[in-house]
């Protein structure tokens, strides 16, 4: 699974995910599902904000990277991906500048056009179930919630989807591509079935121990433990390099 993540996501996103897991004392080689989920969530947050700017009239506009007007103010401030200290510093700065109510939990983005914090969710379950879980945790009408699924569904506070349809379609397409790539590698079933993932992981680890003496076989195949994706963890720069990660994952 770790190999898949490193092939599928941009190195900058992978590095941010590694730092996040290290900050919370988590081992990405053991919690490979969380590693994949964090990378997915980070990429959705970047895609959410990408190309969106605010012009001099305060209107939201979409600008392609080659456009000379790229120096316009970014519509979204990305909070996700920063270490906790820096993230809270950014949140406090936004609150002091805009007068926004300080959230109890760290949000993912701030929308300068709508003047609100945004919580992004990516789920492999029913979107309405995950939305309710998020809303129950946050307990604030000030933070806007937007949930995406790997099946193309989405749900947002008061059905206000913030972005235009084309921008949201890009995110949905990327999530669907990730799902297809996982499925092609036999990872998707264990990704959506926690019990099966744990059962298969134990089986493969036991198999590894029995085959430890066979170095030739070990070198010729991928470690079974790396093929298992455990249950998904639910939950700066905007560069051309980051945008390259939105392309389809390479096949092995």
UniProtKB/Swiss-Prot annotation:
The keyword DNA damage does not apply. Gene3D superfamilies: Influenza RNA-dependent RNA polymerase subunit PA, endonuclease domain. InterPro entries: PA/PA-X, PA/PA-X_sf. It holds the Pfam family Flu_PA. Keywords: Decay of host mRNAs by virus, Eukaryotic host gene expression shutoff by virus, Host cytoplasm, Host gene expression shutoff by virus, Host mRNA suppression by virus, Host nucleus, Host-virus interaction. GO terms for biological process: viral RNA genome replication; viral translational frameshifting. It is found in: Host cytoplasm; Host nucleus. The record marks 195, 198-199 as: Important for efficient shutoff activity and nuclear localization. GO terms for molecular function: RNA binding. It comes from the Viruses. The record marks 202-203, 206 as: Important for efficient shutoff activity. The active site is at residues 80, 108. Plays a major role in the shutoff of the host protein expression by cleaving mRNAs probably via an endonuclease activity. This host shutoff allows the virus to escape from the host antiviral response. Hijacks host RNA splicing machinery to selectively target host RNAs containing introns for destruction. This may explain the preferential degradation of RNAs that have undergone co- or post-transcriptional processing. Belongs to the influenza viruses PA-X family. The probable endonuclease active site in the N-terminus and the basic amino acid cluster in the C-terminus are important for the shutoff activity. The C-terminus acts as a nuclear localization signal. The C-terminus is recruited to host protein complexes involved in nuclear Pol II RNA processing. This is Protein PA-X. It comes from Influenza A virus (strain A/China:Nanchang/11/1996 H1N1). The gene is PA.
